[in-house]
Amino acid sequence: NNTATVISAAPPASSAVTLPSMSPSPSASASEASSASETSTTQTTSTPLSSPLGTGQVMVTASGLQTAAAALQGA
């Protein structure tokens, strides 16, 4: 759980740096969505070996959500 929280703390920070002037609300929503997905994956994965893979997938999905948020902002 601690490792997942540390990993989850990194993507929102990068999204905030990537989209500072556009609008902070979409980045916050993206971070909330990523945190929700992380909690679901953490609950689903009970094996310690599968949890690192799950966190990696969460990282990818979080970046995807950030990209989608950026696309929505651009539109």
From Swiss-Prot:
Molecular function via GO: DNA binding
Highest taxon, organism lineage: Eukaryota
GO CC terms in record: nucleus
Annotated localization: Nucleus
Post-translational modification remark: Phosphorylated by PRKDC.
Function: Transcription factor that binds to the octamer motif (5'-ATTTGCAT-3') and activates the promoters of the genes for some small nuclear RNAs (snRNA) and of genes such as those for histone H2B and immunoglobulins. Modulates transcription transactivation by NR3C1, AR and PGR.
Subunit-level organization: Interacts with POU2AF1; the interaction increases POU2F1 transactivation activity. Interacts with NR3C1, AR, PGR and HCFC1.
Name by which UniProt lists this protein: POU domain, class 2, transcription factor 1
Organism this protein belongs to: Notamacropus eugenii (Tammar wallaby)
Lineage start: Eukaryota, Metazoa, Chordata, Craniata, Vertebrata
